[in-house]
Regions:
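Conserved catalytic core of nucleotide-sugar-dependent glycosyltransferases
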Residues: 91-160
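Hydrophobic targeting segments
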Residues: 2-8, 29-33
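Acidic donor-binding segment of Leloir-type glycosyltransferases
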Residues: 21-60
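A short, glycine-/small-residue-rich helix N-cap motif at loop->alpha-helix starts
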Residues: 62-70, 164-165
Length: 223
């Protein structure tokens, strides 16, 4: 059986993180990356309801907000065959995770975009959310990736630093280029949307423009 580690990117949603931990702790080891330097993530040593100890969790409290790219950088610290990358506003079912594993793809997600070659802006791209499809790139949320595939693009991930937006776009295109494939896959499955609050990256009015700027670099073959 392949081994899996969950990487949760956390920013000001501690209740969501605890809900994800309770769903998966004991099934997979978990790393929580906390990008809120003003409030460390802490988990009780024992869940008061179940009496279960949290034994397989690493908590990384960053002293700076290293944004989303840090979740990919941290993957290289762990030996598991697969990394399941989760945002802190979504909880996939275990059945969905198993489905993603059984597909045995280099990288697979639940959310993707297509139509890059015809689009002139990010909002013109076609959405694929929790459906079985071939897409141009994957979008955050829930992504399962093979560690040996990430190893192929390790230098690019490390050298890019911590860009404000588009880590998922970068990784998607780097993997496509490394493996010489044209599309990536999204899958259907059951998920639970958790409260977003007022801290989502898409609250920034420049969010979609910044993501489109990343797409355009690949569209114009400058990266």
């Amino acid at each position: 059986m392949p081994t899996v580690r969950i990487i949760i990117l956390s920013y000001k949603r501690p209740d969501n993180v605890l809900q994800i931990v309770k769903a998966f702790e004991g099934h997979y080891p978990i790393t929580i990356i906390n990008n809120n330097p003003n409030d460390n993530v802490r988990l009780p040593p024992i869940d008061p309801k179940s009496g279960k100890q949290y034994k397989t969790i690493d908590i990384v409290n960053n002293k700076l907000n290293l944004r989303c790219m840090d979740r990919w950088v941290r993957c290289f610290q762990y030996d598991e065959d697969f990394k399941l990358i989760l945002d802190d506003d979504i909880l996939p079912s275990k059945t969905l995770v198993n489905k993603m594993l059984n597909l045995d793809q280099p990288i697979v997600g639940i959310y993707g975009k297509s139509g890059v070659s015809q689009a002139n802006s990010y909002l013109e791209l076609k959405d694929y959310w929790c459906v079985d499809a071939d897409v141009d790139f994957l979008v955050g949320s829930v992504i399962l990736v093979k560690q040996n595939v990430l190893n192929l693009i390790k230098e690019k991930i490390i050298n890019i630093g911590y860009p404000e937006r588009g880590d998922d776009i970068l990784v998607s295109y780097w993997i496509k280029k490394a493996l010489r494939i044209n599309t990536l896959k999204t899958v259907s499955g059951k998920i639970l949307n958790l409260p977003e609050g007022d801290v989502g990256l898409n609250k920034n009015p420049e969010h979609f423009l910044m993501r489109w700027n990343v797409v355009e670099k690949f569209k114009n073959l400058t990266w």
